[in-house]
């Protein structure tokens, strides 16, 4: 089982789902996470199946200084990174919407988000990180 952590502000929830690094180098795990401020409900989907729902920080508002951190656990917002707690593998695409998607859309492979365009992001790589376009669909 894989462990997925979602941090909202200084609150966090943990989901146990499929291992994020399949044995075949060409297989992938499709992961979707939603969080709604009004209810505080976070939902994790993996490979089109609901993994679970948990409450995390109802009413929290994401500020202008928000950061999206992928593949690295932090002990606190803005805290330090530990290379022994790093994701090892490939992240192909990242999309972000300004609303919670309905379950049907959450299960589908989506093509773009409404808030995040990874091609216009500023990246900060820590350790050995390679950023390249994907070579297969």
Curated annotation (Swiss-Prot):
Record keyword Hydrolase present: no
Keyword terms: Calcium, Metal-binding
Pfam annotation, one family: Pentaxin
Annotated Pentraxin (PTX) domain residues: 1-137
UniProt cross-references to InterPro entries, sorted A to Z: ConA-like_dom_sf, Pentraxin-related, Pentraxin_domain
Annotated residues for binding of Ca(2+): 73, 75, 85
Gene Ontology molecular function: metal ion binding
Tissue expression per record: Not expressed in the intestinal tract including ascending colon, descending colon and rectum. Not expressed in the human colon cancer cell lines HT-29 and CaCo-2.
Disulfide topology: none
Record has Cytoplasm as a keyword: no
SMART domains membership: PTX
Family as reported in the entry's similarity comment: Belongs to the pentraxin family.
Protein name: Putative mucosal pentraxin homolog
Organism for this UniProt entry: Homo sapiens
Gene name in the database record: MPTX1
């Amino acid at each position: 089982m894989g462990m997925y952590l979602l941090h909202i502000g200084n609150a966090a929830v943990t989901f146990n789902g499929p291992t994020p690094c399949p044995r075949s180098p060409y297989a992938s795990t499709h992961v979707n996470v939603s969080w709604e401020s009004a209810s505080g409900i976070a939902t994790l989907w993996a490979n089109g199946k609901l993994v679970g729902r948990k409450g995390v920080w109802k009413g929290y508002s994401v500020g202008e200084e928000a950061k999206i951190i992928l593949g690295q656990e932090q002990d606190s917002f803005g805290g330090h990174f530990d290379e022994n707690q790093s994701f090892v593998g490939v992240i192909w695409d990242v999309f972000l919407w300004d609303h919670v998607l309905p379950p049907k859309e959450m299960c589908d492979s989506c093509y773009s988000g409404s808030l995040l365009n990874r091609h216009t992001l500023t990246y900060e790589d820590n350790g050995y990180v390679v950023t390249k376009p994907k070579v297969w669909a």
